[in-house]
Amino acid sequence: MSQDSKVKTTESTPPAPTKARKWLPVLDPSGDYYYWWLNTMVFPIMYNLIIVVCRACFPDLQHSYLVAWFVLDYTSDLLYLLDIGVRFHTGFLEQGILVVDKSMIASRYVRTWSFLLDLASLVPTDAAYVQLGPHIPTLRLNRFLRVPRLFEAFDRTETRTAYPNAFRIAKLMIYIFVVIHWNSCLYFALSRYLGFGRDAWVYPDPAQPGFERLRRQYLYSFYFSTLILTTVGDTPLPAREEEYLFMVGDFLLAVMGFATIMGSMSSVIYNMNTADAAFYPDHALVKKYMKLQHVNRRLERRVIDWYQHLQINKKMTNEVAILQHLPERLRAEVAVSVHLSTLSRVQIFQNCEASLLEELVLKLQPQTYSPGEYVCRKGDIGREMYIIREGQLAVVADDGVTQYAVLGAGLYFGEISIINIKGNMSGNRRTANIKSLGYSDLFCLSKEDLREVLSEYPQAQAVMEEKGREILLKMNKLDVNAEAAEIALQEATESRLKGLDQQLDDLQTKFARLLAELESSALKIAYRIERLEWQTREWPMPDDMGEADDEAEPGEGTSKDGEEKAGQEGPSGLE
């Protein structure tokens, strides 16, 4: 092999950075991997927020577990460092498109405040342990600068969790705990600075039995801080200026914290009520209306029981209003994932186009019937079909007691009445009484909605009508002669309509020609009128001629005046 071929072979091998990119992919900020990494970062950040300040204020805690603290400290530092690497491999949206170019990601990240805070949180301030000793955990306070990452993790979890209100309450409790924890640590540090047991306000002297234990020190400080910040108990009065300042700061913090907590709890409760109102109908107005209209107690009880069933069993009747803010395509996908399996079980909709079923799914209206309530009665005009989602319906006689059959979940009825099938002996009227045995959840599809959708799918309409004829033939409810007569009548009507359409086209053509002729005649008349107007302007009228004689200059008279003047001068000339 020649040297040139060796060079070409070497150049054709893929470079090493391409392999590295496979091992370090770009993360989608809305993806699962990024979400779980954020949740992982919660632990080192919470560790630094809670443990570092506690170790700084409780010396016994720092001295007793020094090796464990070193391991946890540098483990959290390692996670902090990895988090910076993750930030360099996390894409961002530009013009709605995820940017995966690592150079652009890095350039954008290093120009943000987040990068400066991340670097500052990793400054090795604990290197001062070499000179100051390993018992000064306050050197690690710069690790608190990574707190914005904690807030980001909480926000992502709140949007992803199935119980956002419960998570908001839990997040609020975490904030309250951290505030009380910090306050208790500062209280113990201030007591140590002022002297344990110097007065009733500071922490008691550890020389007393029981107060020397670390657990008692922390719990007493936490209890004292809870009393101050919640203002729900008697606390010893301060005796020194430092104690007064601490109490004033705590009281101000308590006022702000109380207002924040009440506002947050009110917001959570309001959101819960708003969500319930959006999902489930409010029965207060209906109850008030029934009382004002003096509805009988039995009917009022049935209405209230129906509302209670919806509320207790979390039944929704306004799915369209709930999903109205979603884009149309996304709303269709949600409806398909929820209801398509139910709709595809209906015989007349089997083997239909997927797009047709998707549009029909959006038209399904959930309905809930209470025990003993009739869904339809024999002889009623059928304007909708029903699909049983949950519950049992009975086909009963006219007396409402005798049962002929029981329909369960997944069955359907009324599908023939919403399709205009020629020769249907029952027409569009119901042929049976159907009553709900218990609480039943149904899907309703109206004839108008089906007609609106089928107007764009004529082939599917023909297929559905053919399936409906097959069903009626099996039920012996299809009059073939009547169907043939209706078909003949329809063909005759269509033929007449075609003839009328042809006549209408001919009339339109004649009318267009007549209109064109009228426009041409109008143009000719207008042209002739315009010529006459110009001619009348050029020819003088009799009155104008008399005025011209009066205003004529000497020597410029008419031919008659010239003749008279010549006749008078003739004799004189002869003389």
Swiss-Prot record:
Cell location: Cell projection, Cilium membrane
Amino acids binding 3',5'-cyclic GMP: 414, 417, 430-431
Keyword line: cAMP, cAMP-binding, Cell membrane, Cell projection, Coiled coil, Ion channel, Ion transport, Ligand-gated ion channel, Membrane, Nucleotide-binding, Olfaction, Sensory transduction, Transmembrane, Transmembrane helix, Transport
Membrane as UniProt keyword: yes
Topology versus the membrane: Multi-pass membrane protein
Coiled-coil zones: 493-547
Biased composition annotated in UniProt, kind: Basic and acidic residues: 558-567
Gene Ontology MF, one: intracellularly cyclic nucleotide-activated monoatomic cation channel activity
SUPFAM superfamilies reported for this sequence: cAMP-binding domain-like (SSF51206), Voltage-gated potassium channels (SSF81324)
Cytoplasmic side: 1-38, 92-116, 160-166, 274-575
Recorded catalytic activity of this chain's protein: Ca(2+)(in) = Ca(2+)(out); Na(+)(in) = Na(+)(out); K(+)(in) = K(+)(out); NH4(+)(in) = NH4(+)(out)
Description of how activity is regulated: Ca(2+)-calmodulin exerts its inhibitory effect in cAMP sensitivity by binding to IQ-like motif of CNGA4 and preferably binds to the channel in the closed state. Inhibition by PIP3 of the CNG channel probably occurs via CGNA2 binding.
UniProt site (Central gate): 258
Domain of life of the source: Eukaryota
Record InterPro entries: CLZ_dom (IPR032406), CNG_cation_channel (IPR050866), cNMP-bd_CS (IPR018488), cNMP-bd_dom (IPR000595), cNMP-bd_dom_sf (IPR018490), Ion_trans_dom (IPR005821), RmlC-like_jellyroll (IPR014710)
UniProt family annotation: Belongs to the cyclic nucleotide-gated cation channel (TC 1.A.1.5) family. CNGA4 subfamily.
Purpose of the protein: Pore-forming subunit of the olfactory cyclic nucleotide-gated channel. Operates in the cilia of olfactory sensory neurons where chemical stimulation of the odorant is converted to an electrical signal. Mediates odorant-induced cAMP-dependent Ca(2+) influx triggering neuron depolarization. The rise of intracellular Ca(2+) levels potentiates the olfactory response by activating Ca(2+)-dependent Cl(-) channels, but it also serves as a negative feedback signal to desensitize the channel for rapid adaptation to odorants.
Protein name: Cyclic nucleotide-gated channel alpha-4
Organism this protein belongs to: Mus musculus (Mouse)
